[in-house]
Each structure stands twice: as C-alpha cells, then as structure tokens.
Design a protein with these regions (language model features):
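Hot-dog-fold acyl-thioester-processing enzymes
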Residues: 2-57, 114-133
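Ser/Thr-centric signal marking residues that sit
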Residues: 15, 78, 107
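Intrinsically disordered, low-complexity regions of eukaryotic proteins
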Residues: 16-18, 61, 91
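Short, positively charged
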Residues: 45-46, 52-53, 71-74, 91-93
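Active-site beta-strand->loop segment that positions catalytic residues and contacts the acyl thioester
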Residues: 58-73, 79-85
Length: 133
C-alpha cells in the first residue's frame, strides 16, 4: 500500500526529565506524518474538512523499542494498512538519524460526517487517488 516518509526534529520542550521524548508527544508526530501522507497523495486535510468530512482517531497503539532524544531527527514511515472503508488504518515506523528503529505504531481513524456527526464511507475521490500509481 501507499507509503510516505516524514521528518520531525525533536525539540527540547518535547523531552522529559530523563532526557527522552515524552510519550504523549508521539500522537502529534503521527498526526504530522498522516497529514503529510494525505498531502503527498494530493489530499488537503483542510479541504476535506471544508467538504464536511473529518477523521477522528479511533485507536492508537505504540510500541517503544528505543528512546528518541532531544535534537534527534525522526524519520516517520507512514503506510496505509489496507483500502479504507469507514475506517482508515495506518502503520508507522519511527527511526532516528542513525537509522535505528525507535517506535512501531498504528492508528485507526473513522471517516465522519461533520454535519451528521456519524460515520460515513471513505470519499470516492480518496479511493480513486489510492488506485493511482
């Protein structure tokens, strides 16, 4: 399935007293990577919301292998797990600048109608973009 690499530099404020990235920051890193994945596909998250579709996170899983630290440059590999329906699922691998695998993660998001506040199927234009090579 489609994949994309994003890069994030760890800021000092994102670390804890032990000098490692505070675990709560990983959700933000994954969101950055997801939005960049969509943009690389030609999808504007802002435009999608303006068209009445939102994508709240339904499930988030993280497995920490090694610690990310201040000033690390993280490479986040984002992959679509399978063709979306009502849900869209991503897997992630986060590496540091030394190409060490730090974190494995996955997220499941739900396509929702902003107007009706209920789940909907993945918009057809997204499915069409996923079919393109």
């Amino acid at each position: 399935m489609k994949s994309h690499s994003s890069y994030v530099k760890v800021r000092y404020a994102e670390t804890d007293q032990m000098g490692v990235v505070y675990h709560g920051n990983y959700a933000q890193y994954l969101e950055i990577a997801r939005i960049e994945w969509l943009a690389a596909l030609g999808i504007s998250y802002k435009k999608m919301e303006e068209e009445g579709v939102m994508l709240p996170v339904y499930e988030l899983n993280l497995r920490f292998k090694k610690s990310a630290k201040f000033d690390d440059v993280l490479q986040i590999e984002t992959k679509l797990f399978k063709t979306p329906g009502v849900r869209i699922e991503f897997t992630y691998e986060i590496y540091n600048q030394h190409e060490e695998l730090l974190t494995e993660a996955s997220t499941t998001l739900i396509f929702m109608s902003i107007e009706q506040n209920r789940p909907i199927k993945c918009p057809q234009y997204i499915l069409d973009l996923l079919k393109e090579d």
